[in-house]
Amino acid sequence: MKIAKKCKVIVASAIVAALMAGTALPALAASPAGDVPFAVLAQQNDVNADKVQAIKDKLANIDVSYEDGIWLFESAYEDYEISNNKSYMMPYVYSNGETVRFGMSFTSQDTEGYFYWNDVDVLIGEYNNYTSQTNYKFKKVSRQYYPDDQIFLEEVSFGGNDEDMDCLSRILNADTAYLRFNGAKVNGTQRTQTTIIDSESRQGMTDIINLYNLLQSATVEERVAAFGT
């Protein structure tokens, strides 16, 4: 489903543009690295072949796409969640080569209709006895109906920060965690969906966090070499 990817590209492009405003990108990072032979990159001081290979290894379980000057890295487990009509949260990573950032997305799917949610709770622990709660509020949630699948999809993506990374860490360190999509009242009816954060989502979160940390420690040249070869 293209809506989720498009939302991420829009968010990533806007944030990277803001970060780079007034700053010219190095020529090496301005275009897909496939145009730059690795032999040329290897001659530069800031390329470590082992680091490049380590990034490539991490990308084995990641869906990689390039659009509008942005590399987007998404967990391959999102395909599982979408195909099985699940609701989930997932981090993602985006980069223009020089800058590396991570984002967050929340997605709900239902066959009966929209929930019309604009806030989501992350509940750590058992549902009826959770130990912590993080609430996310949103001004705009994208909604689209897919008639072939008879799915009402709602999705939001945004740039992540340290608090979001802390939330992900608490999820991964907990035995159980849930998402609660709090629907708005429409025509006197309010629908709320609660779903467990499953093992596939947890693995996807782990893969993205590991990739993000590795890219943060790499040089521009190492990232570009890994992305394009």
Stretches found by the model and what they are:
Residues 29-229:
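A generic "folded-domain core" signal
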Residues 1-43, 171:
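Gram-positive cell-envelope targeting signals
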